[in-house]
Every structure is written in C-alpha cells, then in structure tokens.
C-alpha cells in the first residue's frame, strides 16, 4: 500500500505488515532520500547531533534521518541565520531527510514561564527571558523557514498524570490546532526548492479511549 501525502511529493509505502501483531515495516520517500521504518532517529536539537562528527553520523551510524527542534532553532541560531544559509540542510551539512518537531513539548516544559490558550502559547525564552508567541500558523511559518522534510504540527503535550477531563480538552484543542496548521501549510510554499510534508501528532495522554 502506497500513500501519497497531500500537498507533497513525499509518499509512504508499507513494505511488510505482521498479520498477528499489525507491526509494520515501511518506506518513506523524500526529496533528500528514503527512510526505512521503524527507524532510530538521532536528535540534533540545535540542528546537529552533539558528540558525533557528520561523517560518523552518515557512514558509521548510517543515520537515515535526524531531528531538529523548532523551539531551540527559532531562538538560537535564529531564523535569519538558517534562512541565509539556505535552510537547515545547508546550515548543518546533512543532506539526508530531516524532521522538525513543533516545539510543543518544549513549551509544555516551560510551565512556569508560559501561558497556554486557544490562540496559542505565550512563553519566555529560557535564554534571555524575552517574550514570544507560538500559534499553529506561526509554527508552520517557522518550520517552512527551517526547511526540514517532515514538519510536525503544533500540539499541547499534557503531563502524564493529567486527569481525563483535561486530557480530553487538550486533545480536542490539539485537533483544532491541527486544522489551523493544515490551512497555513497549504497557504505557504517550501522556501528551498524541495518538498515538505506535514505530519500530525497523536495526543490523549494515558487514556486509550482518547
């Protein structure tokens, strides 16, 4: 089964599905190469994986994809630097697929210095205390500028001990945020000549019914 993602040339194909467990092996095709799933994705919070040379990352670890963090990249080195370099791939020299998370977890972790509401999240930088606002639309614009192959939708990450009522309310807001992310994603174009895809995030805390 091959699924072509809306608004993108990227596609996902099932290579194998286990009939007993529904476990799947898949193949994601991007403009920067293919990703065999399930996959170990090294985390490069600021665009690079710490303690690992780029050559080792590609030739020894054989990383097919790495993750960058939208919140941290937005604050440092900043969007102007990344855009001037021609996107995150040019900035860090990694020519294989990349994914950026939405910054939702980082905003959640700033519980003492952020305000969360329907419009989005207002928070203060952990670096200098400056005030910033992340909305679904703003996050889409930021991820377009960063330029990863896979962009994650903006979501609220609830604490693991959240009560059911709050988890449900949060999940429903995450769904509304996803609708706004999709609208903004479809209103904008990639900046660097290759396709990007928008992936949603499943929320619901520890409650299977959600």
Locations of the language-model features?
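Active-site entrance/lid segments in N-terminal catalytic domains of soluble metabolic enzymes
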Residues: 13-18, 22-210
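Single conserved hydrophobic/aromatic residue that forms the stacking wall/gate
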Residues: 1-12
